[in-house]
C-alpha cells in the first residue's frame, strides 16, 4: 500500500470490495463474505478492524480494552454492518445460491447464527443506536471518517443505507416466507420513509444529518458545507427519493459539485463554521474530506445516475475520474496512470486535479458495480436478471458475454434511436418476452439475448 500494510482488514472496506468481484469470482467472493460475517459481533455491529489472526467466536471487541489497545479502534462505526446487506444480496442474486441464507456462521466474540440471522442482527444494531429524530446515530464515524456525530448526532447517509437494508431484508423474508417479520419490516420501513422525508429533505437536496446538539448539517442556508454528495446519490440508490426529489438533488450535484475531475464531496469547504465533529476542517480547502473529489463516491454517483436512466451523465462521471482518461495530464494528476487514488484535490484547492493515496481505496470495486449494474444494466435478483442499460445516446450497439448461474449469456443491446435507456423489445433465444426481465427458467446453457432500446 501507499505507506505500508495495515494491521488488519477494515470492515467496511473489505465488505464493499467483495461486491466488485462477485460476478467474476463468485466462490472467492463467498469465502471472503463468510469471513467478514464471522467478524460481526453478536449484537450486530461489525468489528472496526478485523485482525489478521481473526479467530471467529473468540475475539475481543471495542467494549474490551485489549481490542482498543491492539487495534487502535475505540468504538463502532455506524455503517460497517450495513454494507453486508447489498453484498449478501448481490452474491445471492448473481449465483441463485439462496441456501446461503441458511448457512450457520459464528459471530466474532460468541454465539453463531444463519446468514439471515446475521442480517437481522445488523438491522438491530442500527435500531438500537437511533438518535433523537429516529434516524441512525453517526457514532464514531459513518463512511466519512471525518464526521464524528456520536450517540446523539444522526447521519442521513447511514439512514439511506438503513432504508436500503429494509428493502433487501424484506425480499429475503418474503423468500423465506417469514410473514410476521416481513410485516414488521414493512411497517418500520414506512415509518423510516416518513421521517426521512420530514427531516432530511430540504427542497432541492437531502441534508447530511444532525450534530449532537441538534444542528442541521448540509441545509441550503449553511455558510459552509451546504450541499453534500453522498446523501443525494444514496437517496437514489436506496430507493427513498421519489422522481422529483431525485431529479432536483442530482441536478444540484451536477451543476454545483461536479468538476472536470469528478464531483467533490461537499461545498463550500469548512473553514470558519465547522462544528466540533466536523474533523475535515483540519485539511486545506479542496483536500480529502474537506471538499476533495473522493474517488469511491464517484462509483455511487455513476450507479445513481444510471438507475435514473441518465446514461450520458453516468458515463461522464465515469470518464472524469477514470485513471486511463487522464494520461494527457499526468503532470497534474501525479499518481500512477493505472490505479485510482483515494481522492483528487477539488476546485477550492490551488492544485485541483492532483490525486493522492494510491491503492488504499475501495474505488475500483465500487466503480465496477457502477459500470456493470449501472451503465451496462446487468441487474440480477433472486428470480432472474433485469437488463437495463443506461448508456450515452451515440452508443448504437454493444455486446456483453456473461457467465450467470452456470449458463453462458450472449447479450446484444441495439440502440437504433439513440436513447439513453429503455426497452422497446427483448428476445431470449428468438422468443420475445415482455419488458426487460429474463427469468432464470428462460435461460439455457447458451442463451442468446437481444434487447432493442
Residue ranges of model-derived segments:
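Non-catalytic C-terminal accessory modules of carbohydrate-active enzymes
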Residues: 255-258, 271, 283-290, 303-453
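Low-complexity, Ser/Thr/Pro/Gly-enriched N-terminal "stalk/linker" regions
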Residues: 1-6, 31, 35, 125, ...
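Long, charged, mostly alpha-helical binding arms that flank functional sites
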Residues: 107-176, 180, 192-199, 203
Amino acid at each position: 500500500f501507499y505507506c505500508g500494510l495495515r494491521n488488519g482488514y477494515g470492515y467496511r472496506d473489505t465488505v464493499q470490495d467483495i461486491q466488485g468481484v462477485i460476478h467474476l469470482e463468485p466462490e472467492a467472493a463467498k469465502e471472503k463474505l463468510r469471513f467478514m460475517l464471522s467478524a460481526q459481533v453478536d449484537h450486530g455491529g461489525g468489528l472496526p478492524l478485523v485482525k489478521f489472526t481473526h479467530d471467529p467466536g473468540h475475539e475481543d471487541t471495542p467494549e474490551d480494552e485489549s481490542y482498543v489497545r491492539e487495534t487502535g479502534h475505540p468504538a463502532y462505526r455506524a455503517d460497517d454492518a450495513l454494507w453486508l446487506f447489498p453484498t449478501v444480496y448481490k452474491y445471492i442474486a448473481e449465483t441463485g445460491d439462496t441456501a446461503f441464507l441458511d448457512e450457520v456462521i459464528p459471530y466474532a466474540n460468541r454465539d453463531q447464527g444463519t446468514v439471515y440471522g446475521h442480517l437481522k442482527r445488523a438491522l438491530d444494531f442500527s435500531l438500537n443506536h437511533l438518535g433523537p429524530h429516529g434516524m441512525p446515530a453517526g457514532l464514531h464515524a459513518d463512511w466519512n471518517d471525518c464526521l464524528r456525530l456520536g450517540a446523539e448526532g444522526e447521519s442521513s447517509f447511514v439512514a439511506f443505507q438503513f432504508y436500503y437494508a429494509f428493502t433487501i431484508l424484506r425480499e429475503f423474508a418474503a423468500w423465506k416466507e417469514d410473514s410476521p417479520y416481513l410485516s414488521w419490516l414493512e411497517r418500520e420501513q414506512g415509518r423510516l420513509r416518513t421521517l426521512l422525508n420530514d427531516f432530511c429533505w430540504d427542497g432541492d437536496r437531502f441534508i447530511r444529518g444532525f450534530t449532537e446538539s441538534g444542528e442541521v448539517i448540509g441545509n441550503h442556508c449553511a455558510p459552509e458545507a451546504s450541499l453534500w454528495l453522498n446523501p443525494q446519490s444514496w437517496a437514489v440508490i436506496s430507493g427513498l427519493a421519489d422522481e422529483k426529489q431525485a431529479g432536483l438533488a442530482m441536478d444540484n450535484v451536477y451543476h454545483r459539485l461536479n468538476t472536470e475531475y469528478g464531483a467533490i464531496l461537499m461545498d463550500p469547504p469548512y473553514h470558519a463554521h465547522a462544528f466540533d465533529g466536523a474533523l475535515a476542517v483540519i485539511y486545506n480547502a479542496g483536500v480529502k474530506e474537506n471538499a476533495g473529489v473522493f474517488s469511491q463516491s464517484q462509483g455511487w454517483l455513476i450507479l445513481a445516475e444510471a438507475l435514473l436512466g441518465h446514461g450520458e451523465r453516468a458515463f461522464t462521471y465515469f470518464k472524469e475520474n477514470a485513471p486511463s482518461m487522464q494520461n494527457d495530464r499526468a503532470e497534474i494528476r501525479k499518481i500512477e496512470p493505472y490505479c485510482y487514488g483515494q481522492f483528487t484535490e477539488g476546485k477550492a484547492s490551488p492544485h485541483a486535479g492532483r490525486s493522492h493515496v494510491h491503492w488504499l481505496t475501495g474505488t475500483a470495486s465500487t466503480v465496477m458495480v457502477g459500470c456493470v449494474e449501472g451503465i451496462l444494466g446487468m441487474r440480477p435478483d433472486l428470480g432472474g436478471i433485469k437488463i437495463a442499460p443506461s448508456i450515452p445516446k451515440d452508443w448504437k450497439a454493444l455486446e456483453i458475454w456473461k457467465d450467470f448461474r452456470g449458463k453462458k449469456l450472449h447479450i446484444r443491446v441495439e440502440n437504433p434511436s439513440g436513447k439513453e435507456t429503455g426497452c422497446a423489445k427483448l428476445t431470449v433465444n428468438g422468443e420475445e418476452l415482455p419488458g426487460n426481465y429474463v427469468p432464470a427458467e428462460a435461460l439455457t446453457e447458451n442463451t442468446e439475448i437481444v434487447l432493442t432500446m
